[in-house]
């Protein structure tokens, strides 16, 4: 098993390019089931979850290729079953449910590993499809759905679920009649999926707002499409620049989609300026201030940037709080940061952070994707050596991270444990 070794205390300086968004690429890849004819997607990040999704597409009857950062896919003989050995490693694979029901009238998709219905919003997906005419059985860990022909419906989500919105968006594109999604997720990745479907011939309006309207069409056609840049990767580099008191020019930065993060970083004393070629990030006056943050669905502050901002607050001149309102158990990184010298107290879903003068390198263990990113950022600024274990989490969401960081001055490399 690999670990990441970081010799901290070095400022990061220079240009750093943001890869394509994994969270946009995954639903768009699964939407490749829908159109007739070939599809070419560019700016696709080379990540483990992407490779898993391509395996799933192959099993479902697509012909796929992955050359550089371009994926080409075409449906040849569509099957209806997504097996457990693939789905267990990646929750996003439940997004093939909508396209399969819409095209084949039947889908058999394994429940993601450890995911009981009700514990995560898989039930929101199923309730929506039931409104569109599908019926479901839960059989030996599989969701087995059937329908004659999905029909448009008025769907009002209890919570603006990203996956639920994406699943219904795909199915409704070729369902019979009009579908209206109220309390729809507004995330940029949902908007990117809608733009892809529109490029394939779908009739969608309202994407990016809380009410999306879809007029079903008989069929979709293939197209060429470029995946949006990864806003969370870009946000992570913003924090890394401020954390190490360096200056980064972040290229291919989706600046408008990071408005809530940029607002908080500026309040903390970080300068972020758009210019030709990217966004230049550095400390405004040398000091970092604490702020109060509450995670919310988009356009609120993203839960996926919570751990990184907490890490920056650890070196602030003052104190701040973070209230996590999206996920439970999203503070797994706190004890690891404390091992590096951070002053953090937890009370329920709120973390109270008081800044310290310096952090010290230590062996730490990543518990999830964003926690691992926060530990890498902490290691970049810490005095001495930090070993980040379990970086397979990191490999799920960051393309060539150590190569990109090394190119802007970081002393970071991969070792086998």
Swiss-Prot record:
Membership in a protein family: Belongs to the EPSP synthase family. MurA subfamily.
Encoding gene, per UniProt annotation: murA
Modified residues (2-(S-cysteinyl)pyruvic acid O-phosphothioketal): 115
Keyword Cell cycle among record annotations: yes
Cellular component annotations (GO), alphabetically ordered: cytoplasm
EC number: 2.5.1.7
SUPFAM superfamilies: EPT/RTPC-like
Binding site for phosphoenolpyruvate: 22-23
Principal location class: cytoplasm
Functional summary from the UniProt entry: Cell wall formation. Adds enolpyruvyl to UDP-N-acetylglucosamine.
Protein's recorded name: UDP-N-acetylglucosamine 1-carboxyvinyltransferase
Pfam families cross-referenced by the UniProt entry: EPSP_synthase (PF00275)
Catalytic activity: phosphoenolpyruvate + UDP-N-acetyl-alpha-D-glucosamine = UDP-N-acetyl-3-O-(1-carboxyvinyl)-alpha-D-glucosamine + phosphate
List of residues binding UDP-N-acetyl-alpha-D-glucosamine: 91, 120-124, 304, 326
Entry keyword set: Cell cycle, Cell division, Cell shape, Cell wall biogenesis/degradation, Cytoplasm, Peptidoglycan synthesis, Pyruvate, Transferase
Gene Ontology process terms (BP): cell division; cell wall organization; peptidoglycan biosynthetic process; regulation of cell shape; UDP-N-acetylgalactosamine biosynthetic process
Pathway annotation from the record: Cell wall biogenesis; peptidoglycan biosynthesis
GO-annotated molecular function: UDP-N-acetylglucosamine 1-carboxyvinyltransferase activity
Subcellular location: Cytoplasm
EC top class, as a word: transferase
Catalytic center residues: 115 (proton donor)
């Amino acid at each position: 098993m690999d670990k990441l070794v970081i010799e901290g205390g070095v400022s990061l300086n220079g240009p750093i390019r943001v890869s394509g968004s994994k969270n946009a690429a995954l639903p768009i890849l699964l939407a490749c089931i829908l159109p007739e004819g070939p599809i070419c997607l560019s700016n696709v990040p080379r990540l483990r979850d992407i490779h898993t999704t391509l395996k799933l597409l192959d099993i479902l009857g697509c012909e796929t290729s992955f050359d550089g950062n371009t994926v080409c896919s075409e449906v040849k003989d569509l099957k209806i079953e997504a097996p457990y050995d693939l789905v267990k490693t990646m929750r996003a694979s439940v997004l093939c449910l909508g396209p399969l029901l819409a095209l084949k009238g039947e889908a058999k998709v394994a429940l993601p590993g450890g995911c009981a219905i009700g514990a995560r919003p898989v039930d929101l997906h199923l309730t929506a499809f039931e409104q569109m005419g599908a019926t479901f059985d839960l059989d030996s860990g599989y969701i087995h759905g059937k329908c004659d022909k999905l029909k448009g419906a008025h769907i009002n989500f209890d919570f603006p679920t990203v996956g639920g919105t994406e699943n219904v968006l795909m199915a409704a594109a070729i369902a019979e009649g009009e579908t209206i999604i109220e309390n729809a997720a507004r995330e940029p990745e949902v908007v990117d999926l809608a733009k892809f479907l529109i490029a394939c011939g779908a009739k969608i309006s309202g994407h990016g707002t809380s009410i999306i309207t879809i007029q079903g069409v008989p069929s979709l056609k293939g197209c060429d499409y470029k995946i949006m840049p990864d806003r969370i990767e870009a946000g992570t580099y913003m924090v890394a620049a401020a954390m190490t008191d360096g200056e980064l020019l972040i290229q291919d930065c989706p600046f408008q989609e990071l408005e809530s993060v940029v607002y908080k970083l500026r309040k903390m004393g970080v300068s972020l300026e758009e210019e030709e070629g990217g966004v230049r990030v550095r400390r405004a006056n040398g000091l970092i201030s604490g702020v109060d943050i509450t995670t919310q669905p988009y356009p609120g502050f993203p839960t996926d940037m919570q751990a990184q901002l907490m890490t920056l607050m650890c070196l602030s001149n003052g104190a701040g709080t973070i209230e996590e309102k999206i996920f439970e158990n999203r503070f797994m990184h706190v004890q690891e940061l404390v091992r590096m010298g951070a002053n953090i107290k937890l009370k329920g879903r709120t973390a109270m952070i008081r800044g310290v003068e310096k952090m010290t390198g230590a062996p730490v263990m990543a518990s999830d994707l964003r926690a691992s990113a926060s530990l890498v950022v902490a290691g970049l600024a810490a005095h001495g050596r930090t070993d980040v274990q379990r970086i397979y989490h990191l490999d799920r969401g960051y393309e060539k991270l150590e190569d990109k960081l090394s190119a802007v001055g970081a002393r970071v490399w991969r070792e086998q444990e």
